[in-house]
Amino acid sequence: THTTVTYRELIETLRQRTEITYLVAEPRTIQLGGAEIQVLPLLPPGSADLNNRSVGLVVRYGAFSAFLSGDSEIEELTFWVDQEVVPDVTLLKAPHHGGADAVTSEFLERAQPEVVVISVGVNTYGHPHPEAVQAYEAVADMVMTTREQGQVTILGYSDGRYEIRTGGV
């Protein structure tokens, strides 16, 4: 977990390094072998919550796709829906550990994930929130948490198939 002071110190250190080309995500597409990584636009400056400055990625490998959203909450998810950058995906890494403040019906209607993985451990925040889990279960064929399954590895294939491996709680 970062603090605002730590975050600002990191940014200042990066700014002092001349080999750094960019500091924040700029919307772009990166080709990586047979895969494509789409870096989503950031919210315009002004959000008070650093979670809503998370980098969003859509990873595509042929017919397999994954949406990775970091700690994004409703404000950033709504922004991405409004920007029309949320595609149908095979896999969704649940935003903000499955928090109630990080899921909207509009976002899920756009993403239509087959599998949702919630990265979460024992915590005092109540993550994942039962309402968020219920929303994921309404659209996805499978909802998994790392608290229950341990490490979750998804192997995606270009024909759209995928394998799920779990273990090591």
What residues fall within each predicted segment?
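Non-globular, low-confidence helical/coil segments that flank catalytic cores
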Residues: T1-V169
